[in-house]
């Protein structure tokens, strides 16, 4: 509603941080602000007073606010949630690692968030190679141990193990 109002000519939006504010129904500024700053449909027409450096503190602001309120952050929150730039599906991970623009509407760093490619039973070789690389382990795509590792993870996840945080 806020973006539609802005399109219609409104120049001031009242909002909340993480949905906490004066009344219910107010826009979450943690979602509205990056949309206005990062999306071409808005950033060339409106001035927010928020530069790229300030915007990089958005995730920290949102999480810090939840911390002050003794709330768990919303992992699915747009832009700032832990899952906002996360994938575990093999084809998504492969494309994302080759060119993040294929699946990400903005670079996660612009809002102070991180890209996460998780290891799971849905993952392919790219997921595992990326996870191993982050730990300083280089492995070739055709290394037979990689197929063995993927097989073990898939078998274990079928019995209840979870490696998404790995």
Regions found by a protein language model. Give the residues of each.
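Short secondary-structure transition/capping segments
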Residues: 1, 24-28, 153-158
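Catalytic cores of alpha/beta
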Residues: 1-10, 27, 31
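Alpha-helical structural signal in soluble globular domains
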Residues: 4-8, 35-39, 64, 68
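Hydrophobic residues within beta-strands of alpha/beta enzymes
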Residues: 13-14
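C-terminal helical cap(s) of enzyme catalytic domains, especially alpha/beta-barrels
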Residues: 21-51
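A mid-to-C-terminal "edge-of-domain" accessory segment
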Residues: 43-166
């Amino acid at each position: 509603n806020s973006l539609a109002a802005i399109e219609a000519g409104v120049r001031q939006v009242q909002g909340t941080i993480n949905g906490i504010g004066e009344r219910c129904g107010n826009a979450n500024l943690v979602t509205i602000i990056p949309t206005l700053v990062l999306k071409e449909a808005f950033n060339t027409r409106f001035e927010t007073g928020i530069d790229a450096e300030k915007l990089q503190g958005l995730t920290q602001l949102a999480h810090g606010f939840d911390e002050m309120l003794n709330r768990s952050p919303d992992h699915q929150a747009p832009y700032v949630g832990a899952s906002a730039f996360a994938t575990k599906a093999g084809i998504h991970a492969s494309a994302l690692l080759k060119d993040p623009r294929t699946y990400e509407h903005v670079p996660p760093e612009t809002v102070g968030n991180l890209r996460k490619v998780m290891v799971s039973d849905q993952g392919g070789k790219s997921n595992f190679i990326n996870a191993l690389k982050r730990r300083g382990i280089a492995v070739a795509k055709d290394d037979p141990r990689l197929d063995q590792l993927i097989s073990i993870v898939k078998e274990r996840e079928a019995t209840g193990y979870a490696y998404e945080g790995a």
